[in-house]
Amino acid sequence: MLQTKDYKRESGGGRLTLKVLLIGLVVGGLGTSPPTFAQESGQKTFSSPTAAADALAAAAQKHDKQEMLAILGHSGEELIYSGDRVADKANNDHFVEKYHQMHRFAATGSGRMILYIGAENWPVAIPLKKSGAKWYFDTSYGKQEVLYRRIGSNELNVIKVCQEIVSGEREYYAASHDGDSVHQYAQKFRSTPGKQDGLYWEVKSGEPESPLGPLVAEAASEGYGHHAHHAAGKPHSFHGYIYKLLHRQGAAAHGGAQDYIVDGKMTGGFALIAYPVRYRDSGVMTFVANQDGQIYQKDLGPRANQIASEMTEYNPDDTWQPVDGTENTKVSDIRG
């Protein structure tokens, strides 16, 4: 459904932390007065705000997206379908949990009712509005704010994940793997079964974690499973973004154009790209980084997914902007 996260940057070392709180339909920013919107044709109406909220919570609990669309109207489709099924399910579950924990209503000066949920009194971005004797969710009123918050939280998360991947590649390079004494970077995320030719491999009890072990464990705890990044050669989304390793760099990169792989081993460096599953829905900016740790970002436009998925080299020219606080990232800054 919808999501928000309470996030912040900690001072000292540039470490990025995310206090993830996935709550469906919850955002702030309702103090402004956007234009008035009409009820959508065919949208369900209710006898009271409580009846409307109860119906939405019941539909979310059953993950009944058709019923949720009937309640929110067709303009709510982008809010319900983010492109990340795991995140959508988690958001539904958290909304239901917070709704049943506590909920109340408060009137606004614009004639709408705001639903607050959970002990934290989170305001739901989509207000309720009265039409005649009936109430309905005024989805268009709060839709843009919901998308802004979803995109913002996803983009902060992708920076953290990129830093973890940089840290993981450095950790991989520092050790030998599969009896090969040559120091090299991993060419893929998930290792071949029984090998350590990727950044993640399964370990037995008591064995050290693989470089991406903690990140994969975090993804698994959120419902993404061990295939959070790639499986069978197919990319999978993680918090609305897809990640891909790049094996060469272009002329705009420091050191000029070159292949990272020499004689089958990636010794010359590494790079990665992270791009949104759905442009202006799960994210806007596309991100790249290499072994130096500096992350760059660029808005590739509506074709971002296609453009980024076809990229084969790291080549941040002057149209790419550095992400503040990620320059010269140290492993200690990321791992803590």
Give residue spans per PLM region:
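C-terminal soluble interaction/assembly domains
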Residues: 268-322, 335-336
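Flexible, glycine-rich surface segments
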Residues: 172-283
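N-terminal secretory signal peptides that target proteins for export/translocation
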Residues: 1-16
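Short beta-strand edge/turn micro-motifs at domain boundaries
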Residues: 113-156, 160-163, 294-298
